[in-house]
A protein has these predicted regions:
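Extended active-site neighborhood of metal-dependent phosphoesterases/phosphodiesterases
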Residues: 101, 105-201, 269-275, 291, ...
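Sec-dependent N-terminal signal peptides of Gram-positive bacterial secreted proteins and lipoproteins
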Residues: 4-22
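N-terminal active-site segment of His-dependent metallophosphoesterases
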Residues: 24-101
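Solvent-exposed loop/turn segments at secondary-structure junctions
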Residues: 37-40, 95-98, 128-132, 179-183, ...
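His/acidic metal-ligating clusters that form di-metal
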Residues: 82-85, 172-174, 183-273, 378, ...
Length: 564
């Protein structure tokens, strides 16, 4: 009997081992993703006054990121990446701010030290900023950053700085140089797509799962991103590149460039879903990076640099700001980038700023912009509420009340304050301002008021020209004749309101409410599938007893009475 029990126990152990072997998931791969580091030695010199809005943060300019703090942030990130659970770090471009020789030397030293101390490999590709130094060619980039991917590459493209490297026994990284040296636009052309196709075929032949990375976005992550940053999105007008990625087996691609923190998806013609995960700039709000785990599913976790060595900050930053950076660095980044975006909005909503962005050849429109641009900026900076007016009637609330509507009560100071909040929410990820929120209500009514104020002194013909221009710029078609709304101030407000509600609101809604999937902490489908569908618990029990019975029959196979 003891022998029988021992045999049964052995069978159970063998069965357990068989079960684990048969149903084990793929070994996990964990990577850290960080981009748009913008390493720059220029800002290590004494910080000077760049704004008169916030005395404590007077060094903050309109860069929309934190260049003075960049080196301290990068070192803080490397310290955290050294301790986290990832096996490698991938960097989809803009490693430096301008590709200068001293910048490259400085960041290479930091990366080399990180690899030597941690044993973790860094894999990098260029961004447009890395090519801003026209002396930097793909060949030079490959030489400068040789130990960060190229040294382990199983294949390197001759014409670009693209390469392929195995991250593990199961996963292969296709690191794509998506840039055109000296320009901001992407360079994913037919020849690069052919190279991607070829790598996809090789990966399939080798049984590898392809993970992609490059600098410019593959998919659109915000409304009008293809208009706002021409050439910054590979598939802004043509989705054929996404089809190539899907067929090549690149289910996930990591990008940068736009400084958004967002995940977008695309369903190919054959039903394959691919994901483009763009990570916010490391020098942006909350200094974000991702830790991504590849297994049966793909788990995204957003983290941010929690602490920096404030002794690395340049002179000229106020003591109060340094103290905040020391005690609560995430809050420091939020205050500083909010201020920077306010400066950006103010810069581009003047006559000069609008003409610089739009670059119009239409003399009539340029003349109208000269007339209305500064009034537009004035309206955006007006107090939102009457209680804060410095001049009677000069508030957004006073304007909308003239047209029998109202604003919800909030803590926002003006329209730019609101715009910064909404824009920052998009940059941070998982933004959620539905159409019924106070923010969207104020945004739509406030924009109508701003347009009415800005266009109050133009002719009827100029008024209709501006509204039709906005409609054309946004690429929409609405059956509205704006010449019917050019008469009284009331009619002009109605025209502006129609423009906002029928054209802008649907587009704003797409920007203020994040579509699935989530952006920050989310679990998405993996590459790996079980060799066969895992049986149910009941099926496992039946299989166990069948195996047990077969074993017992085998044990007594030579007993005469069992063979009769």
């Amino acid at each position: 009997m003891k022998k029988f029990l021992s045999l049964v126990l052995s069978v159970l152990m063998l069965m357990s081992a068989f079960s684990v072997a048969a149903w084990a998931l793929d070994e996990e791969l964990v990577i850290t993703v960080v981009n748009d580091l913008h390493y720059n030695l220029t800002y290590t010199k004494k910080a000077t006054k760049a704004n008169s809005i916030n005395a404590d943060f007077a060094h903050i300019g309109n860069a929309s990121r934190l260049p003075h703090e960049a080196i301290a942030i990068i070192k803080g990130f490397l310290s955290e990446a050294a301790e986290n659970e990832s096996q490698a770090v991938i960097i989809p471009g803009d490693i430096t701010d301008g590709g200068k020789k001293n910048e490259v030397k400085g960041i290479v030293e930091l990366f080399s030290k990180f690899e030597a101390e941690t044993g973790k490999q860094i894999y990098a590709v260029p961004g447009n900023h890395d090519y801003y130094n026209l002396k930097v060619t793909p060949e030079k980039f490959k030489n400068d950053y040789f130990e960060f991917g190229y040294d382990e590459a199983i294949e390197i493209d001759d014409d670009t700085a693209s390469y392929v490297v195995d991250l593990s026994d199961e996963y292969r990284l296709i690191a794509i140089d998506s840039c055109v040296p000296g320009e901001g636009r992407h360079g994913i052309d037919s020849s690069r797509l052919e190279w991607i196709k070829a790598q996809g075929e090789k990966a399939k032949a080798d049984g590898k799962k392809l993970i992609g990375m490059h600098h410019q976005n593959l998919l659109e992550h915000m409304i009008f991103s293809g208009v706002i940053q021409p050439g910054g999105v590979v598939t802004a007008k043509d989705k054929s590149a996404a089809e190539v990625y899907a067929k090549a087996g690149i289910k996930y691609v990591f990008t940068g460039h736009t400084h958004d923190h967002d995940i977008a998806s695309y369903t190919a013609a054959d039903g394959t879903v691919i994901y483009d995960a763009v990570t916010g700039s490391l020098n942006g709000c909350y200094a974000p990076y991702r830790v991504v785990t590849f297994g049966d599913s793909v788990k995204f976790e957003t983290r941010g640099v929690q602490k920096i060595d404030t002794s690395l900050l340049p002179e000229g930053i106020s003591a109060n700001a340094v103290a905040l950076a020391e005690s609560n660095f995430p809050e420091y980044t939020k205050i500083a980038t909010d201020l920077s975006y306010r400066l950006v909005f103010n810069q581009y909503t003047t006559a000069k700023g609008l003409k610089g962005v739009l670059k119009l050849e239409d003399e009539e429109m340029n003349a109208i912009i000269d007339k209305v641009g500064n009034r537009l900026n004035e309206a955006l900076n007006m107090p939102l509420y009457k209680e804060n007016e410095t001049e009677e009637g000069k508030s957004i609330e006073a304007i909308v009340e003239k047209y029998q509507t109202f604003l919800p009560e909030t803590e926002y100071k003006d329209m730019i304050d609101l715009a910064v909040t909404i824009y920052q929410a998009h940059n941070i990820g998982d933004e959620s301002f539905p159409a019924y929120s106070d923010e969207v209500i104020i945004l739509t009514r406030g924009l109508a008021a701003v347009l009415s104020y800005a266009l109050a002194e133009v002719s009827a013909e100029e008024y209709a020209t501006v509204l039709n221009f906005i409609v054309d710029l946004l690429g929409v078609d609405i059956p509205v004749n704006f010449t019917s709304y050019t008469g009284s101030a009331v009619k002009r407000f109605e025209g502006a309101e129609i423009l906002v509600t029928t054209v802008a609101l649907p587009l704003v809604a797409d920007f203020t409410t994040d579509p699935a999937p989530g952006d920050c902490n989310v679990t998405l489908p993996g590459y790996a599938e079980l060799v066969e569908e895992e049986p149910s618990f009941f099926e496992k029990i039946i299989a166990f007893f069948r195996m047990l019975l077969d074993t017992v029959r085998t044990m007594f196979a030579f007993v005469p009475s069992w063979n009769k």
